[in-house]
Amino acid sequence: MARTPGALLLAPLLLLQLATPALVYQDYQYLGQQGEGDSWEQLRLQHLKEVEDSILGPWGKWRCLCDLGKQERSREVVGTAPGPVFMDPEKLIQLRPCRQRDCPSCKPFDCDWRL
């Protein structure tokens, strides 16, 4: 009795599957419905925030960019992550409109102080 090529491949594939260890990440255990989306996604986002907080330094002081009517502050990467971390620029630099009390050295036409 001749076997089909698919049947000949099935047995080795099943043995390979049984011999291959499964990778289970503890971060992705399902914890049930919490009413605010998928629990796995919440754990993943929490883990990413912990990694970012562990590798980023504190925010620096605000500095005036009065020619642009804005203030800027930044922070630096001070540690290393256990894996690749891709950060958006807003995690390293923040901008806000400048105010007269924050920029006493600026001339009135440099900033919109109504904000």
UniProtKB/Swiss-Prot annotation:
Keywords: Signal. Residues 1-21 form the signal peptide. The keyword Methyltransferase does not apply. This is Thrombospondin type-1 domain-containing protein 8. Residues 53-104 form the TSP type-1 domain. It comes from Homo sapiens (Human). SUPFAM superfamilies: TSP-1 type 1 repeat. It comes from the Eukaryota. The keyword Transferase does not apply. PROSITE patterns: TSP1.
